[in-house]
Regions:
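Non-catalytic, mostly N-terminal accessory regions of nucleic-acid modification and defense proteins
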Residues: 1-200
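Conserved class I S-adenosyl-L-methionine
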Residues: 201-208
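Conserved SAM-binding loop of SAM-dependent methyltransferases across substrates and taxa
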Residues: 211-216
Length: 216
């Protein structure tokens, strides 16, 4: 009896995380994994921050109408743990300029602008990184398109960005080799430690949290 086509598709179909990784990796060119990881992860952050901002922005517009003072108040975003993004730091702006020759500089300015408006991120984001590594603007634009298409695979109850971020971290750790993936702790070890210490109450202090994946 012939096998069902749906079964074969299930076995061969790649996850969206794997598809994104493969597509992004093809655009890497001569950039080494330790460098390229910042390119990919920063774009994922910008997309994530942009999605969260737009949802909060729409909520505020519905509540306050065209009152820009209230709609554009950083505090109105911070109270719900959303980063406030100036116009030139928003994902729509990045997408609109994705094919421009100075897109690297625009991304650097976006990251700097987000830090300036959100003190909790001070020193956490790459500074003038895209401009310094000399990545081809056409390849960077294509990578932005890939990251932009992530949104169509999201659902309201799914931590999609968390899964993609963790997937990329694990793959970069593998590419960098032994001793160079210190920032990433395998999920199996994270689960084991969490089950052992049962951190379900109070506060957790970790002065060497790295990417923060264990907290997530």
């Amino acid at each position: 009896m012939a096998k069902k086509a749906t079964t074969a598709k299930t076995k061969t179909e790649k996850s969206i995380e794997a598809q994104l990784w493969d597509a992004a990796n093809k655009l890497r060119g001569n950039i080494e994994a330790p460098e390229y990881k910042h390119v990919v992860l920063s774009l994922i952050f910008l997309k994530y921050a942009g999605v969260r901002f737009e949802k909060q922005h729409a909520k505020l517009v519905e509540q306050y109408g065209d009152n820009k003072i209230l709609v554009e108040s950083p505090m109105a975003y911070a109270k719900d743990n959303v980063f406030y993004l100036p116009e030139e730091c928003r994902w729509d702006y990045i997408m609109a300029n994705a094919k421009s020759s100075d897109i690297a500089q625009k991304i650097d300015k976006a990251l700097a602008g987000i830090e300036a408006k959100n003190k909790a991120l001070e020193g956490a984001l790459p500074s003038n990184y895209y401009s310094s590594i000399g990545i081809d603007s056409a390849k960077l634009g294509s990578l932005i398109d890939i990251v932009n298409n992530m949104e169509q695979h999201m659902t309201d109850d799914d931590d999609f960005f968390g899964r993609v971020y963790e997937y990329c971290l694990s793959n970069f750790a593998l590419q960098e080799g032994k001793g160079k993936g210190e920032y990433y702790t395998p999920k199996s070890i994270v689960n084991l430690i969490t089950e052992m210490i049962e951190p379900y109450k109070g506060k957790v202090y970790d002065p060497a949290c790295g990417s923060g994946g264990m907290f997530v």
